Swiss-Prot record:
It holds the Pfam family MraZ. GO terms for cellular component: cytoplasm; nucleoid. This is Transcriptional regulator MraZ. GO terms for biological process: negative regulation of DNA-templated transcription initiation. It comes from Parvibaculum lavamentivorans (strain DS-1 / DSM 13023 / NCIMB 13966). PROSITE patterns: SPOVT_ABRB. The gene is mraZ.
Length: 161
């Protein structure tokens, strides 16, 4: 498995530790890191972005394509790299979420890990529930954005369900 998939709810203990879902740990470990990388989101929403080393390297490549002295690159690097944290798994598969990221996302006693392919998100459960309702309403309008690379999966004549 090379991607983060699924939704898992876990408790944060009094020390700020949370158990990373086993399937998410497996993805990151397969990519060569016994931990995860977390950083603030670039989009609106109260959550933390997370990934393994493969997506982190992609972020580096995206930043490398920008003018190294541009204001935009400096700001993006500040958020994506400067505010990021490499969090190593303990013997029980837990990581210690940094205070700044927990506060940013409004995380207190419980989190929802949400897979997003090459990355994942860590949400406060109520915030994710509201986001999920909105996503379910809006996602039918995004269907055309998904284009299959396999001819056998393309609908005939553009018809839908």
């Amino acid at each position: 498995m090379n991607s983060f998939r699924g939704r898992y709810t876990n408790k944060i203990d009094s020390k700020g530790r949370v158990s990373v879902p086993a399937k998410f740990r497996a993805v990151s470990i397969a990519q060569g890191l016994n931990g995860i990388i977390c950083f603030p989101p670039l989009s609106e929403g109260k959550f933390i972005e997370g990934c393994g080393p493969a997506f982190s390297e992609e972020i580096d490549r995206m930043l490398d394509r920008l003018d190294p002295f541009s204001e935009e690159r400096d700001m993006l690097a500040s958020v994506l790299l400067g505010e990021s944290a490499e969090l190593m798994f303990d013997a029980d598969g837990r990581v210690n979420l940094p205070d700044n990221l927990r506060e940013l996302a409004g995380l207190t006693d419980e989190v929802v890990f949400v897979g997003a392919g090459p990355r994942f998100q860590i949400w406060e459960p109520g915030a994710y529930a509201a986001f999920a309702v909105e996503a379910q309403k809006r996602v039918p309008g995004f269907r055309e954005l998904l284009k299959s690379t396999q001819a056998s999966l393309r609908p005939e004549g553009g018809g839908g369900r």
